[in-house]
Swiss-Prot record:
Belongs to the elongation factor P family. The lineage of its organism: Bacteria, Bacillati, Cyanobacteriota, Cyanophyceae, Synechococcales. It comes from Synechocystis sp. (strain ATCC 27184 / PCC 6803 / Kazusa). This is Elongation factor P. Disulfide bonds: none annotated. The gene is efp. Coiled coil: none annotated.
Length: 187
């Protein structure tokens, strides 16, 4: 149990049988009446955001969320198979749990898997990944003057917009949060 006075951004609580993460909180002490805590909560499962007010000192169950580092080993049909880096146990994750993140996951990539009571809630990717371009239109000399972009298909099947000077076979950095081109890979 956690007191509403101890809420901080990122605190996870259980409310109505679901896990909620505190996005914003504000302790309010009105001139008349008792103090309260106004919060914005985000559902970890659905992403919905709700506003909820708690009395000061009210206790709610705290969610015991665990994060474990796992490595994507292979894809079995449409299931993504990850291996826990400490216990070496394998876990299959459905594409609907991954959502849009699935298009940036490649083999041997390390991710953080968030679980609650044995249920996988989320898979957190690194903020950027290096992927190879497998298909794009060829660049023509002098194309950079216009500053335009063209579509490129990556090794994972994702499609991103890249500058005109980028060629097929190059390795680029991609932001996993929005799928935007960040630059060429220097390694």
């Amino acid at each position: 149990m956690i007191s509403s006075n101890d809420f901080r951004t990122g605190t996870s609580i259980v409310m109505d049988g679901a896990v909620w993460k505190v996005v914003e909180f504000l302790h309010v002490k009105p001139g008349k009446g008792s103090a309260f805590v106004r919060t914005k909560l985000k559902s970890v499962q659905t992403g919905n955001v709700v506003e909820k007010t708690f009395r000061a000192g009210e206790t709610v169950p705290q969610a015991n969320i665990e994060k474990s580092v796992m490595q994507h080993t292979y894809k079995d049909g449409d299931q993504y198979v990850f291996m826990d880096m400490e216990t070496f146990e394998e876990v299959s994750i459905a594409p609907d749990t991954l959502g849009d993140k699935a298009k940036f996951i490649k083999e041997e990539m390390e991710v953080s898997v968030v679980t609650w009571d044995g249920t996988i809630l989320d898979v957190e990717l690194p903020t950027s990944v290096v992927l190879e371009i497998v298909e794009t239109d060829p660049g023509v000399k002098g194309d950079t003057a216009t500053g335009g972009t063209k579509p490129a298909i990556l090794e994972t099947g994702a499609q991103v917009m890249v500058p005109l000077f980028i060629a097929q076979g190059e390795r680029i950095k991609v932001d996993t949060r929005d799928g935007s081109y960040l630059g060429r890979d220097n390694a």
